[in-house]
Amino acid sequence: MSAVVTLLATGLAVSPAVAAPTAAEGKARVGADWAKQSVTFTAAPGQVNDLHVVPMDQGDGVRRIGFRDSVPLQPGDHCTYLEPGVETYVVCELPTDSARPDRIDVFLGDGDDEIATSDPGVATVSGGPGDDMLHAHTAHTVRGDAGDDMVMGRVVLDGGDGMDHLMAVDGDQFLWGGRGDDMIEAYDGKDVVSAGPGDDHVMGGDGDDIVFGGSGDDMLHGEAGDDVLVGGSGKDTVEGGPGRNITLP
């Protein structure tokens, strides 16, 4: 069990939480910090965002990242509107000769927001309060926060409070359901799942998974692979599936 705790701690430590800066009043703000090789997007209070973060062209010592939304944006340092008068599309630049890896952090704030990411530099996405659709396939860490959220990402998924649906992608991932009755789909890879409090439904998918049900009446399905399934307190249904499994109530 100590090895599992170490594994969980290692996964969380890769992309630490970042405090959200304050957005420009009335508009979401996106700006770059070349000293930190980072770009930060912060939604304005009361906005409902439909954000796309996309890679663009590269040249003259910089690469460009596009931020397209359904609401007006305010460009900060090293960022500008794609076209004059079009306030919903901002392009930011990062130098290509930095020793640091690119880091893009997105804070969506309140509202029922949506995001889709395809840029590989996305580090964290925080949905904030509201029922969010977070299709952040390239993001390392995705947090739904409060609300009934759809959460998708590359390494660490955290549903937060609410009835959330977490969907992993290929690879080894860490998935936390949080409080609420959650649906968690781990898919391929050696995944670690902690469903949290609530009546949760977990599907391990292919791979050797470790699944903790937590409190509540959970349904845990290891599916293919050599899985470890721990039900926790509550009236749980635990099924290992094909493979050499360890199941505990």
Language-model features: where?
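Glycine-centered beta-turn/loop sites at beta-strand termini
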Residues: 108, 117-118, 127, 135-136, ...
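Secretory targeting and sorting signals
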Residues: 1-21
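Residues at the loop-to-beta-strand transition
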Residues: 112, 121-123, 129, 139-140, ...
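Right-handed parallel beta-helix
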Residues: 80-136
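Extracellular beta-strand repeat scaffolds in secreted/surface proteins
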Residues: 37-43, 61-67, 113-119, 133-138, ...
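A low-complexity, Ser/Thr/Gly/Pro-enriched, surface-exposed linker/loop concept
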Residues: 60-93
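Short linear S-[DN]-x-LW-Φ motif typified by the pepsin-like aspartic protease active-site region
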Residues: 20-73
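Consensus positions within tandem repeat domains that build extended binding/scaffold surfaces
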Residues: 112, 131, 148, 163, ...
